[in-house]
């Protein structure tokens, strides 16, 4: 485990989908000082990007008070969306540069509300490249899918 600063929450999140759309899952690994918490869930019919957003939302929602947070994701869609594209989309009335509606607008709006509660630094890591915490988040996301499939909801 890499050395971590005290009093900062480290949130590692990932989304996964089997088929796109298809059954999907999200996973979150949270670390704060010596404490660790794992969260996961799944949805019967979703997309990979929706699960990436949901992972970040659920991780941030789980924090009971405003915090300093370092979020690590392997999703450029999530990282660039929240740090670069969101203000532009809002200025354009939730339209992309080619005038089409932004996909997943309700999730982006929910994520923005959660982000506003905290001071966040966003990091991107290459997926499936051996980053230990990202691999755990990926395993949790896949557990979410497995649980959805086990329930027989497709």
Curated annotation (Swiss-Prot):
Mg(2+) 2 binds at residues 14, 138. Residues 5-146 form the RNase H type-1 domain. Its EC number is 3.1.26.4. The keyword Transmembrane does not apply. InterPro entries: RNase_H, RNaseH-like_sf, RNaseH_domain, RNaseH_sf, RNaseHI. Its main location: cytoplasm. It is found in: Cytoplasm. It catalyses: Endonucleolytic cleavage to 5'-phosphomonoester. Binds 1 Mg(2+) ion per subunit. May bind a second metal ion at a regulatory site, or after substrate binding. It is an enzyme of class 3 (hydrolase). Mg(2+) 1 binds at residues 14, 52, 74. The keyword Repressor does not apply. Its cofactor is Mg(2+). GO terms for biological process: DNA replication, removal of RNA primer. Pfam families: RNase_H (PF00075). GO terms for molecular function: magnesium ion binding; nucleic acid binding; RNA-DNA hybrid ribonuclease activity. HAMAP family: RNase_H. PANTHER family: RIBONUCLEASE H1. Monomer. Belongs to the RNase H family. This is Ribonuclease H. It comes from Coxiella burnetii (strain RSA 493 / Nine Mile phase I). The gene is rnhA.
